[in-house]
Amino acid sequence: MEELKGYLEKSQSKQQHFLYPLLFLEYIYALAHDHGLNVNGSIFYEPAEMSGYDNKFSSLLVKRLITRMYQQNFLINSVNDSNQNRFVGHNKNFYSQMISEGFAVIVEIPFSLRLVSSLEEKKEIPKSQNLRSIHSIFPFFEDKLSHLNYVSDILIPYPVHLKILVQILQCWIQDVPSLHLLRFFFHEYHNWNNIITPKKSSYGFSKENPRLFRFLYNSYVVECESILVFLRKQSSYLRSTSSGTFLERTHFYEKIEQQHLVVLCYNDFQKILWLFKDPFMHYVRYQGKSILASKGTHFLMKKWKSYFVNFWQCHFHFWSQPRRIHINQFSKFSFYFLGYLSNVPINPSAVKSQMLENSFLIDTVTKKFETIVPIVPMIGSLSKAKFCNVLGNPISKPVWADLLDSDIIDRFGRICRNLSHYYSGSSKKQSLYRIKYILRLSCARTLARKHKSTVRAFMQRLGSEFLEEFFTEEEKVISLALPRISYPLHKLYRERIWYXDIIRINDLVNHL
C-alpha cells in the first residue's frame, strides 16, 4: 500500500490519478488473489490439466496476461475470439475476468487512501470493528425512534443505467483509460439485470466478480444518498445562508431543470428547503433497504416521498415506483431491518396519586423501541435449509448423517450459538427459544438417524453434555449462577445485549 500511495502522490501532482498503468503490475493481481481467498475463492489458479497439480496460485498466468495486454487490441480480440484461450479450459473469458478482478482492487485505492488520510487528520483512528458493526444501528434506534411519529420504509430502486454508473465514477476518477475499461466490462457483462438481483433484504451480485459490482453499486447508493445529506445539512442553517450559494455547490439541480420537471429552482430554492426542514429526521440504510424516520407530519413524509421519486427519475433516468416507499405511523407499523421485526408500540398505564385525603388516577403513555425475532420468516428460512418442515417441526438432516458425531453436534451447535449471538438484542426471547429448540431436536434426529436409534434413547445417553453445545458463553455463565441468582441478575439475563463484533448479517437471517 505504501508503494501505491507513493505512485498516486506522483500522479496527483499532475492533477490526476492515473490508475490504468497499475493493471500492468503483477502485485495488483496478487492482492486480488488474496482477497479472493478470504471471500469465495479466486480464479488466479493454474488449471489442473495444465500444471499437473491441484489448484495453486500461478504467477505464470499473471505474467502471460500482462504480456498479452501489451499487444494491440488484446481485450477486443479476447472477446471476439474467446475460444483461442484453450489452456484455460471451459472459462472463455478467463483473461478479461482476471483483469476485472485486478481492476476492482485498483478503483478502490483512491477511496481507501482518502479514508485513511481523513482519519489521520483527526488524529484518531477508531477500531475497524466499531466502524463495521451493523448492530451499532440498534442502540441508535433505541435512543431516537421512540420520540418520532412516522417512518418510511424505502427500497432503493434498481437497476441503474450503465452510463449513469460511469458518470458517477467520473466525479472520483479522472483517469480516462480506466473509465473506458469500465465500459468494456459493462459491454462484456451485457445482461446487467442479472448482475444486481433483488432479494427481500439484500442484493446479490454477479458471480463473475462480486467485488467490482459491489463497489459500483455502493457508488450508486452514495450518489442516491448525497442529495439527502445535502438537504439535511442546508436546512439546519438555512436562514443564515443565501440561496445563491447552494446552486454553486452542486450541479444536478440544473439537470433536473433541463428535464422540464422543476423540483428545485433558483427563485424558490430557499422556500423549498424550508419545506424540508426537519431537525428530528433520521436516516439509516443497510444494503438496498433504508429507513427514514421523522417527528414531522404525514404531509412532510409525503413530500419526502415525492421528492425521492422525482430525483430518481430525473437524475438516474429511470422510473421508480412510488409503492417502493411506504409511510406509516410508528405506533401502528412494524418494519423488518437486519433480520429483526421492529416497532414502537404505545403502552398506556394508570398511576395512582394521592394528595392528602384525595386520590386520583393519572393516565400515562410510554413508548419503547421493541426488537422481535420474526418467527414465521425464520421458520421458513430453517425449512429451506432442511432443519424443519414448513410448520416448524424439526426434521433430520440426511446430508450430514455421514459425518462424525462430534462434527454433527459442532455444526448444529455453531449455528445455534451464532443465531443466539445475532439475536441477543431481542426484547422477547420466546421466538429465539423456539429456534434453538428446532436446531437441538434436528441435531438429535440426525444423530438418531445415523445410529438407527430413537431420539429419546439418544438424548438419555448423551444427557446434559449434549445441550451444553448449544449454549453461548454468556448463557453458560448465567446457567451456572441460576440456582443462586438474585432478581437483578435474572432481569439482566432477559435484557437486550448488542454486540459490536457483528459485521455482517447472519446467513440464515439473510433469507428473510
UniProtKB/Swiss-Prot annotation:
Keywords: Chloroplast, mRNA processing, Plastid, RNA-binding, tRNA processing. Disulfide bonds: none annotated. One of its GO terms (biological process) is RNA splicing. Pfam families: Intron_maturas2, MatK_N. One of its GO terms (molecular function) is RNA binding. It is found in: Plastid, Chloroplast. InterPro entries: Domain_X, Maturase_MatK, Maturase_MatK_N. Transmembrane segments: none annotated. GO terms for cellular component: chloroplast. Usually encoded in the trnK tRNA gene intron. Probably assists in splicing its own and other chloroplast group II introns. PANTHER family: MATURASE K. Belongs to the intron maturase 2 family. MatK subfamily. This is Maturase K. It comes from Zantedeschia aethiopica. The gene is matK.
